[in-house]
Amino acid sequence: MDRAIRRNDIDEKALLRKLILEKRRALSDKGRREKSLAIQQRFFLLDEFRQGRVIHLFLSFRGEVMTDGIVKEALALGKQVVVPVVVGGSEGMNLSEIRQYPEEVEPGAYGIPEPKKKFIRRVDPATVDLFVLPGVAFDVRGGRLGYGAGYYDRILGGTVPSRESKRVSLIALAFELQLVDRIPSSVHDVRVHKIITEERVIECMKSGMY
């Protein structure tokens, strides 16, 4: 029975991922820029951003919310900016600091922007105050559907719950079209605390994990 439920969830995730990615690809370049700017403006007002010292930001790829302006502003404010580096294998993904953008960045694995090899400065995930996360789809309870590799579930699941000294904030940037009624999830899936869209800031229901 449990195996059948898991199989159904996997199938549902695959279908949902396909549908939402198609919707996102249909956005015009102009529409994506305008929506991304609105999301950026809302994000800059968050206490989590203003007070955060070490911030993980994803470097936008294909149809994702554009993060260039956020990266530049965070660096200009003197924050330590950390970005993902796909390494494959059991580690899957590491984090690395960048100090100049876009000068230190180039296309990496799968064409995803990441630091050039000579600028890799590995960072412990446990030092990060704020994780700004990408994703394919989200629900208002904080459910997140990623691209299927499980990189963030692994890196956050292994570090966030063990941090007793301070709470790390998990914030997703997404277009309204990426919101769905329910994301199929398991106990290993990481939920976000807030979702920022071009129209609103969603305070997600607290998950049992945090």
Predicted regions, residues:
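Surface-exposed, charge/polar-rich loops and edge strands
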Residues: 1-11, 22, 76, 101, ...
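N-terminal active-site beta-alpha-beta segment that forms phosphate/nucleotide-binding
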Residues: 2-127
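A residue-level signal for conserved active-site and pocket-lining positions in enzyme catalytic cores
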Residues: 20, 57, 81, 132, ...
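Short beta-strand segments
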Residues: 58-60, 84, 133-134, 172-174
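Flexible, active-site-proximal loop/turn residues at the rims of small-molecule/cofactor binding pockets
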Residues: 61, 137, 201
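Charged helix-capping and loop-helix junction motifs
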Residues: 72, 147-153
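A structured binding-face within diverse protein domains that lines the active/interaction site
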Residues: 113, 134-136
